[in-house]
Every structure is written in structure tokens, then in C-alpha cells.
Swiss-Prot record:
Active site residues per record: D631 (proton donor/acceptor), E831 (proton donor/acceptor)
GO terms of biological process kind: trehalose catabolic process
Notes on how activity is controlled: Inhibited by validamycin A.
Organism listed in the record: Candida albicans
Lineage: Eukaryota, Fungi, Dikarya, Ascomycota, Saccharomycotina
Compositional bias per record (Basic and acidic residues), positions renumbered to this chain: 125-144
Protein's UniProt name: Cytosolic neutral trehalase
The gene coding this protein: NTC1
Function according to Swiss-Prot or TrEMBL: Hydrolyzes intracellular trehalose to glucose.
Cofactor: Ca(2+)
Biased composition range(s): Acidic residues: 111-120
Subcellular location: Cytoplasm
Amino acid sequence: MFTKNHRRMSSTSSDDDPFDVAEKYYGEERKKKLNRVRTFSAFESTKYGAGPISPLRPTYEPPPVIKETSEPLSSSSSTSSPPTLTPQTSQVQFNLGVGKTKNGSAIHSDSEEEEEDEDPVSNTKKGEADEKDPFDTTDSKLENENSTPSSITGKEIIPHPTGFRGSSEESAIRRKPSIIPIYHDNISQESVIRNANTPTTYNREKFHLRRGSLDESTFIRPKKYYINDVQGTLRELLANEDTDNNCQITIEDTGPKVLRLGTANSLGINQSSIRGTYRLSNLLQELTIASRFGRHQIVLDEARLSENPVDRMKRLISTSFWNNLTRIITKENIVDMAKDTKIKESWIDDQGKLHENQESHRIYVPYNRKDQYEFFQLIKKQRSDIQLDVQYLPQKIDADYIKSINKKPGLLSIATRPDPQAPDSGSLISWPYVVPGGRFNELYGWDSYMETLGLLTDVKIDPSGNPRNLRHLELARGMAENFIYEIHHYGKILNANRSYYLGRSQPPFLTDMALRIFNKTIEVTPELMDEAIDFLKRATLAAIKEYETIWCAHPRLDDKTGLSCYHPEGKGIPPETEPTHFNALLKPYLAKYNDIDQLDFIEKYNSGEIKEPELDEYFLHDRAVRESGHDTSYRLEGKCAYLATVDLNSLLYKYENDIAFILQSFFNDNLQDPYDDNNSNKIHSSKIWLERSHQRKLNVDKYLWNEQDGIYYDYNVKLQQQTNYESATTFWPLYAKLASSNQAAKLIDQSLHKFEEHGGLVAGTLKSRGEVGLTRPSRQWDYPFGWAPQQILAWIGLVNYGYDGIARRLAYRWLFMMTKSFVDYNGVIVEKYNVTKGAVPHRVDAEYGNQGLDFKGVATEGFGWVNASYVFGLTFLNLYAQRALGSLTPPEIFLRNMHPEQRKQYK
């Protein structure tokens, strides 16, 4: 028996979040719900109180709140699963042709026939101006990252006067949808909020239906599609739209750019069109993900296909990409983690069997970490199915030892803690970390700092007062803990935790990284103050050790200038490079030794049998370039170990001031060092660090600053002259607060224009790079390429000196370029971009190519510091700028058409 509190509605409606993470959206629970789908349900209690349902009664239900939770690689994955086991794609059979269609499957059409539920367009008359100045953002507040729009939740929105789409209204609100992507704007200012109990008065002139908003939800329930054959729809979609057969749908594909799908309310009988590259590529991504979760049938929210690209990028980075880039060493994945794919060797297993030219599985443990050695040996004993070689490192690690194990590569152990579930078992738990890209398993140096900036952006206190995204805080903390471990056991923060990187560091960021993690910890979990102080103490002591024993010691410190250089330890040819990487370099030496085989030459050169001083110097600089993190660039090639670079000395200046600040603010300017190698119980105070920073500034001003050009140059300590190479690292003194206010002003006035391009800051200028060609190929850290860390450090530096508007402008340029590529090219996020191009900035013609391009159907990781640059960069933009970004407004148009008062915010 039906009561007056019931109303008839579609059974496919639910309170499920249309933007939920893939595991929940396509997981087992959704599969169970799909089994109950039918054309119509019985009746369901109305949410609008007692009384009969009138045709004028509002029928709108506000969209569910967007939740930010963690998304694993697959429904069965966990932190203990092997990181290399990404979601399998074997279920997706791409490009197999078009199968027969059934009810609910895709029907591909570009016809103009009537559709069930088409997109509304504006009722505003052509040429009629809105009452509100579109450039006036005085009512707009900076949107918090990953916050959900309160304007569409918890309250009722004024419905259409008729409560439904009647025939009398059809001519005004129905037309064929545009091929241009229509993005749902989840934070529309046009949303009208009222109290449900307040009498309603309607003003038709106030109601505007606009592309790119959820206004249509005022009249109808958000649309859902019923796809009863995921694989068949995938094949149909790819066969018709993927004309270049790369399993992606982009603006370069020449298909009809329209696909008809069955609606969920009709169980697939009625059809509705999906149009445009962006929505179709999103459909491809969603179908690919559903297939990897083993789904054969799904109900798909239209909102997931039409999601504002800024919101979609931010959501995927926060809930999916970080998870897929997370690694943690466990019992289950230790073999996959230890495997070295760059170097193959011959080895004998425990049964005496010889394995030739195969990948080995080895892990090295510090000489004084017996607990880790026994733990890994226990894993080896418990798992007879694995071949794991566990080795101790010697106490003294030098260039000769590093060279001696070049043919026995292995993973270097990192920080662990006792398993709280079995404290007496000897079982250990590793700290998690984020890798740069999907193909990596190692912890990298300055990548981790940039990733930390992005991770911490998501860690907040929600409106209810509870911390959210604490997992991201744990990841940031884990990377810092691993750095502390590396400094104490390997002497430095490593390029990466592989044996052939033992002599090589990367740009130092530990002090700022530790301070940001400390501040975020006490912000969201103030009850952990004591633990946070202990963490800050250990990080500071580690940074002091790194500073004194690595960066300000031989061979990296130049005594004459008092400045530091990238100058790693090592001998021979780097073993991790591709076998053919040095072909051109070695060719004349092979001829010199009677056309000796290249592998034989490398063997004899590395052993010292062949001595070539010129090659020794070349590989010294080659290792130094890799330590700088800028591998490779003509700025550094052939001279890096002799350069006192502006980037390194800016970071060391920041170390000096950060350490002084920490000692003064948290440790009463008196911190005892229990790690002092001389066992002298050394006491650290701020005085010496302030003196060091003062002296470094004097040295930088003398040797690196060029008053005439208004720029910082590197200084060649061997030639005793500036290099005059114009590099974006000239902005790093702003990040470190090393420049005076006059130097900063001159740098902005005379040099910024040399680096500002369509997509942000270029790594170096065309003038400095020079001509490139077959004999002088492009280098990836030179013009015309731009990198996320260069943007991030410049933004921070500009704000440090009050140039907020310029930082905002540069951030908009970089984020627009990323968003445009994401929309036009199937959700791509890559390692680096050509910032001078507006059309295809993600295509990079330089060594190593561009990571992040090679995916089938859906990108699942992006690239670590590029992901970070996006979510971090959004914090520099107000709501108006973020909306312009979502509508793909190019920087030139965005800045040119801006209200004069607003334009001041970008200067």
C-alpha cells in the first residue's frame, strides 16, 4: 500500500557519489547494486515532507558531496602488494572491430535525430548582458583545494516553476548539444539557495541555463548511462574514434566525435549522445578502469564525463595518482623492489644453478643494521620461491668500493620501524614514499621534496574539525624519514637508493621539507606535538651532518670562493646508462686501440687497465650533471664539477638560515648532537649558522650576481669567471631569500621577460642554448622545455619578495598548458613540457623522450612533481582564475580581457 509520503522515481537513482574513487565507483558494492537495476522501482518516500505530490513540487535532489579518499591500483591491491603490479589490461581487447549491438550497448551515430535528454542552452537573449560584471570577483574567495562546494549541499535549490520539463517549455530549453565539451562547474555562482519551508516566488528572468554548469540539475535528475557490455562499448568506441590506433582519443583523431549510449532510467532502451573529444576520452578512461575492475555492466554518471577538467585533474591526482606512485618495501614485494632492470649479470642461486645474463634480486644493508639484515634473511628463509641476495655494506664507502659492485647492483635498504602488530618477532615495517613515475621503484632526491609540497596541499581540517588526507601527510613524513636514514647510513641524500648511486647526491631540500611537515603535523594533529618536535630534531641533525660532511667538504667545496659545486664520488663509466649512450663519445677511443670491441674497452677502462685522463674528466662532469638533477643541459655539460652553481648555493644558504631558525625557535638555541662522529657531544647554536649564511651571501654577490645584466650566473672555479648562461635557476635565490630587495627588483625588471613563455618559465634561453642539430642535439633541461620544479621554486620566490601578481600569472600559464594537454590528449600528464608551444606542449624532442605518454586507455600515475605542481599551483589562483582555467581560456586572452582592477593582481 502506497502512502502520501511516497513518490515514483527511477530505480537507478542513488546517493552514490558520481566522483567517487574507482575502487568504490566500480567495486564490488556497485556491482551488487547494479544487479538490482530495473526500469522503474516501486515508490520511494519523498524527501519534501508530507502531503500529496504536486506537479509544482520541487523534484531536485542536490548532487552528492565530492569525497576525497584513497584509490588503490585495483580492488584487491593494498600497501603490501608489489608496486610493480599495476592494473592488468588483459581484459581490454583494443581495436578488435565492431561487435553487434544490443539494448544498452553503444550505438555510434553522427545523425541529428531527436535524443532523449539533450543539453540545455541559455534562455538569455542574444546580446543581453548579465547583471553582474563577469570580471568582478569581489565576492569570490580563494577556493580551498579539494573542498566540496557548500552551495550545492545541504540546502534546496529553487526548481523550475513547473517542476518538470513540460511540452510548453521545450522550445525554450531544448536543442542539440554542442560538439564542444560541456563541463560541469561544481561551484557555480548562479546556484540559488533558499529555505525549503520558505514560500517560493519565481522570476523567470533570473533563471539562466548555461553551458558548463549544473543548472540543468535544477530541472532534472543528473543523467546516468546504462552500459550492459563494457568490452563491446570499448571496442565500438575505439574502432570509431581512435583513428590513429594508439588506444587514446585525442583532438588528432578524426572520428565523428559522437557516441550514443543507453540511459539508465530506460535500462538502455532510450539513447543519448556523448559528444566531443573531452567527454569521449573521459568515457574511454572510465570504461578502461571499469574493465580492469572486472566489470561487464556499469551505470555511469554523465557528471563523470563532463567534469570540469580542473576538478578532474585535482581529483585524480589526489585520490588516484599519488596512490599509484606510492611504494613500500614488504615481505610480499621485496623481490620486485630489489630487481634491477638496468643491469643484467650472471649469478649462482642457492641450489648451485648458474643464471646467465639475467636480472638479479639483491638488497644491500648498512654494516650496523643487524635488525634489517636478519629481517631480510628471514624473508628469504620463509619464501623458498624467491632468489634474494642480502648483502652487508662496509663501514667505509668510497669510489673504489662503489666501482667494485657495479656488476652486482642492488637496492639500498631505507628506513624501517618495528611492526607494532608483532613487536617481538623481529618483523619490520618500511616507511612509504612516492616515486617520480610509474616505472620507478626507488626513492629519489629532490623529486620527493616537490612531491611533498603537493601532498601537503591536500592535508586539511574539514568543516567538522577532523583532519583529512592524513595518508598524504604520512607519505611526506615517510620520505623525510628515509632521507634522515640515508644521511646517517650512506652519508648523503642519494640520487636514488640503488648501489650505483652511493657516491651521488641531489639538490638539498631537507630543512624546508622537515619544517613544512612539522607545521602541517601540528596544524592537523596538535596532539602529536612531542612526536613532531622529535622528528624536527632528527631531521635538523641529519641536515647539519649532510651540510658539514657533503656540501661543505672536499671535493664539493671550493676553498677560494667559499662556494660549493656538484662533485660526486665515482670512477669509470656510469653503469646505469644505456649500453649505447656513449657510442659517439667512445668511437675515437675504440679506433685508438685498434678497433677494440666497445664492451672490452669499457671493461678495461673501468678496471684501470686503460687510462684516459680526458675520459676521466668527462665522466666526472657527467656524474656531476646527474647529481645536480639537471641531466642534461648545455649549461652544465663538460664543466659541471667546476661550477659553483646558483641553484646549489641558494639551497645551502637556505639550509643555513633554516637551521638557525629551528635552533632558535624550538631548541632554545642549544641542541646537542648525539651523531657527532668524534663523540664530543657537540652543541649546535644559531650563531655559527647565521655567520655562515652571511658569508655565503657575500660570496654569492661577489661571484654569481651580475649587476649589469640583472641576473645570477654560475661561476667556473677553474677558469675563475662567470659562465653567462641564462638559466631559470636564477630565480632560486628568491626562493632561498638570498637576494636583496634591489637585486630582486632588478632580476624581475631585466631578466624575467627572457624566461616567461606561453606555458610558464623556460629552463634556459634560446640565446644561451645556441643552435641544435644532428651533431648538437637538444638537451631536456634547455630551451624550449619547462619543468615543474623550476615553476614551483619561482612561484614561492616571487611571493617571498611581494611579487604575488607575477607568481599568479606564471602559475596560470603553467596550469593552463597542463589543463589544455589533459583535455585535448586523453588525460595526459607528463614529466616536462615544451612551454613555447600552445598546441602540443607535451611532445618533447630530446633525449629520454617524455615519461607519462605511453599508456593505453587511461593515464594512472601522471608524473610526481608535475602532479604536485598542479595542486600546489592552484593555491596561487583565486576562484575566478580557476574557472577561467576550467573553461580553457588561454593566458593571453585571460589577461587581455580582464577588468583593469583585476589585471593589477597579475602584475
